[in-house]
Curated annotation (Swiss-Prot):
Membrane topology of the entry: Multi-pass membrane protein
Species whose genome carries this gene: Escherichia coli O139:H28 (strain E24377A / ETEC)
Top-level EC class: hydrolase
Keyword Cell inner membrane: yes
GO molecular function, one term: serine-type endopeptidase activity
NCBIfam families the UniProt entry points to: PRK10907.1, rhombo_GlpG
Residues annotated as the enzyme's active site: S201 (nucleophile), H254
Subcellular location: Cell inner membrane
GO cellular component, one term: plasma membrane
Name assigned to this protein: Rhomboid protease GlpG
Record Pfam families: Rhomboid, Rhomboid_N
Length: 276
């Protein structure tokens, strides 16, 4: 028996089990603190993990509900959460994902109250040689956002991609990707535009590159990003580079972040293949 994953919401677990049953794969649920999903036939593990990655992208897809009807489990007596939106948020996000989201929101509120400049004096990339040993500055620039749309866009992608990485590969992997991409994307961006920039987008682009390439080269990792979304990311970089939308974008951070994510995914997938 091989444990595939755990769900906080037992109804979500049952939906996945029902769907896999329609695909000819038998999974079982064991209730502990969470709903643990187990696979008896370990030879099917790769297929199940690939399907799990797709399921986590959109658990509300009609095909999963249809599978529950087909399996006869829609009236299973499981407890439905009162707030499915927040249950979905918790389902995908681990502690590191939440900590970064909360930190970004707190910094954003502080910027609205104190003003952008006041907060940037404390968190921006070192803008004076005397600040080069204030090491937090090499990372905290990623926590600053300058509009509601800016922070919503970045946090949505952070939750979607960072949560998947943390759930499947662990908090440590997400921390490493975040710190390395924040450092290197910040370094490149300050070479382009100076120290007065901010936002999580460099890290988000690193996660896009990492999740896409790792999923392509190592499907057993359980993470996956549709090719259409990585194409969208590339189009957005080109649009920002040529200023097609008249918006100020951290183009250097975007390119550097994407490169960092791709490089880390290549190395990790190479190591995964060597272990087989």
């Amino acid at each position: 028996m091989l444990m595939i994953t755990s769900f906080a919401n037992p109804r979500v677990a049952q939906a996945f089990v029902d769907y896999m049953a329609t695909q000819g794969v038998i999974l079982t649920i064991q209730q502990h603190n969470q709903s643990d999903v187990w696979l008896a036939d370990e030879s099917q593990a790769e297929r199940v993990r690939a399907e799990l990655a797709r399921f986590l992208e959109n658990p509300a897809d009609p095909r999963y509900l249809a599978a529950s009807w087909q399996a006869g489990h829609t009236g299973s007596g499981l407890h439905y959460r009162r707030y499915p939106f927040f249950a979905a948020l918790r389902e995908r996000a681990g502690p590191v994902t939440w900590v970064v989201m909360i930190a970004c929101v707190v910094v954003f509120i502080a910027m609205q109250i104190l003003g952008d400049q006041e907060v940037m004096l404390w968190l921006a990339w070192p803008f004076d040689p005397t600040l080069k040993f204030e090491f937090w500055r090499y990372f905290t620039h990623a926590l600053m956002h300058f509009s509601l749309m800016h922070i919503l866009f970045n946090l949505l992608w952070w939750w979607y991609l960072g949560g998947a990485v943390e759930k499947r590969l662990g908090s440590g992997k997400l921390i490493v990707i975040t710190l390395i991409s924040a450092l290197l994307s910040g370094y490149v961006q300050q070479k382009f535009s100076g120290p007065w920039f901010g936002g999580l987008s460099g890290v988000v682009y690193a996660l896009m590159g990492y999740v896409w390439l790792r999923g392509e080269r190592d499907p057993q990792s359980g993470i996956y990003l549709q090719r259409g979304l990585i194409i969208f990311a590339l189009i957005w970089i080109v649009a920002g580079w040529f200023d097609l939308f008249g918006m100020s974008m951290a183009n250097g951070a975007h390119i550097a972040g994407l490169a960092v994510g791709l490089a880390m995914a290549f190395v990790d997938s190479l190591n995964a293949r060597k272990r087989k």
